[in-house]
A protein has these predicted regions:
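Structured binding/interaction patches within domain cores
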Residues: 2-139
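Short, low-complexity, intrinsically disordered N-terminal peptides in bacterial proteins
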Residues: 1-2, 169
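C-terminal binding/interaction regions
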Residues: 125-169
């Protein structure tokens, strides 16, 4: 059996470079809304019973509409991160990490790329299984390409307040 990785993808992949360039053009709010919606749709269903993750997604949505302060949101983000660490199973844990990391984009805009690496692993493992490593990279690449298309679709043209991004990779 191939060694499972927590994440799939890499910053040297052309699709990741394109994602990075697109992320750099958008505001933290746009990135957060996109990441939370994408993770809730694609990865949260793979997590099984995950009340802390569901609460974090709802908390982020409330924060983005002004119904919850960042101070009130932070405990939900911490609980989601802890729940992701404690999740069992390769698919479930990768999906949980993707969801928790997506929720934290509002605090750390570079998570808009990081959550996708966890999500790519969750998608690949759920589609190919954890035994068939030969398909993982292709499935991960397809997942990242889909995410890039979705980000481009919701991007604000000529965003006046792009997030301050410092890629440490």
């Amino acid at each position: 059996m191939a060694k499972l990785r927590k994440t799939l993808g890499g910053t040297d992949w052309p699709v990741c470079k394109a994602l990075m360039r697109q992320i750099e053009t958008q505001s933290t709010v746009t990135l957060s809304r996109w990441a939370v919606d994408h993770a809730a749709r694609e990865y949260l269903p793979l997590c099984g019973e995950a009340p802390a993750l569901k609460a974090a997604v709802e908390g982020c949505r409330k924060h983005l509409t002004g119904q919850l302060s960042l101070k009130e949101l932070k405990p939900l983000l911490r609980e989601a991160s802890a729940a992701a660490r404690d999740t069992e199973g390769a698919v479930e844990q990768a999906a949980a990490r993707a969801t928790a990391t997506a929720c934290a984009v509002i605090q750390t805009p570079t998570n808009a790329l990081g959550y996708l690496f966890y999500g790519a692993a969750a998608a690949a493992y759920s589609k190919a299984g954890t035994e068939d490593a030969s398909r993982w990279d292709d499935l991960a690449r397809a997942e990242l390409e889909q995410a890039l298309e979705e980000l481009r679709a919701v991007s604000v043209p000529d965003e006046p307040n792009p997030a301050k991004i410092n890629w440490n990779c």
